[in-house]
Amino acid sequence: MNSTPSESEKKEQEPSPVEISFLDIYQLIELFVMLLSEQAWRYIGLRVDPRTNKINKDLAKGRVAIDCIISLVDKIGSNLDNAEIERLRRLIADLQINYVEQMK
């Protein structure tokens, strides 16, 4: 019995890409915020880089990612409900606190 997956099985195992053309601008910005936050956690050294399975700490890049998140959240804040704004503000605070801790 062949244990290697067939091409159709490989296709089924791959995650489906998000169809971004159906997202409005605010949803796109929220997606960017989530992508930037993942990168920020990696750059401040608290998440493993999935490509290398290593911690690749780069605090300068982490700071840029956090600053971009702040800017994006400030830009879309008036279009979000209070719960979503609070969630994003907590994310920013968590990133900032952990960034400072990693600088020590």
Regions found by a protein language model. Give the residues of each.
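A charge-rich, low-complexity, intrinsically flexible signal that marks solvent-exposed coils, linkers
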Residues: 2-104
